[in-house]
């Protein structure tokens, strides 16, 4: 399945993510901040596990769900020390006019379907984008933000903004509706030789419809 279902649409979290970056910038004047999304992990041969971005990356960009393997957010301090210039480095999609269309199983649209391009990510996030190949080598070696930045982000994430609070409320409502669907399936559950899996499939399917996935695997 392709990952482009929200291509080109402005992210509802965009304004809140910009405020988070502004607050973080004020905490670390003159400091370069690097927040990678993380990479895909191989499950078997050319099959990868479902991608989940690093929480700090998702928090600062407003991108959640499965966006975007290999991406790196860089907040470069301005020369006067007042604020940061932010760039989101991404792997561009390999369309039909690119040899990677067939040869790259991770970026080729022949394999993974339509994906957002750089401009579409700019629309979604409000952040200037650039190809990942343009990311300076020294920055590329940074695996994660510094401990001080991670600590600050952890504390920021503990206090939820309006967008996050509404997302939590929506998740609660969706969870209740999911359990109601399970109750509707109970007659089938007791008759089926794998009734527990009927429950699992019902609830997990609802979670995928209304959100991204179940919040906890256990």
Model-derived features: positions:
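Active-site environment of non-heme Fe oxygenases that use a 2-His-1-carboxylate facial triad
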Residues: 176-183, 200, 204
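Residue-identity detector for glutamine
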Residues: 157, 166-167, 185, 200, ...
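C-terminal helix-coil-helix/basic helical segment that borders enzyme active sites and/or dimer interfaces
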Residues: 11, 180-194
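Short catalytic-site patches enriched in acidic/histidine residues
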Residues: 45-51, 147-152, 190-218
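A composition/biophysics-driven feature that prefers long, compositionally simple stretches
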Residues: 1-180
């Amino acid at each position: 399945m392709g990952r482009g279902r929200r291509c080109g649409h402005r992210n509802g979290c965009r304004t809140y993510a910009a405020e988070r970056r502004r607050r973080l910038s004020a905490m670390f004047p003159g400091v370069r901040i690097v927040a990678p999304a993380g990479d895909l992990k191989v499950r078997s041969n050319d099959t990868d596990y479902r991608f989940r971005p690093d929480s700090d990356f998702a928090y600062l960009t407003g991108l959640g769900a499965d966006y975007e393997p290999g991406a790196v957010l860089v907040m470069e301090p301005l020369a006067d020390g007042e604020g940061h210039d932010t760039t989101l480095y991404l792997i561009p999609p390999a369309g039909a006019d690119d040899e990677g269309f067939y040869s790259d199983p991770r970026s080729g649209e022949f394999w993974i379907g339509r994906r957002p391009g750089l401009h579409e990510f700019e629309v979604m996030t409000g952040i200037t984008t650039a190809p990942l190949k343009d990311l300076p080598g020294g920055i590329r070696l940074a695996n994660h933000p510094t401990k001080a930045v991670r600590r600050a982000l952890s504390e920021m994430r503990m206090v939820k903004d309006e967008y996050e609070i509404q997302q939590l409320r929506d998740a609660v409502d969706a969870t209740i509706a999911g359990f109601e669907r399970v109750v509707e399936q109970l007659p089938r559950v007791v008759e089926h030789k794998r009734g527990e899996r009927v429950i699992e499939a019902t609830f997990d399917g609802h979670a995928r419809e209304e959100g991204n996935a179940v919040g906890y695997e256990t």
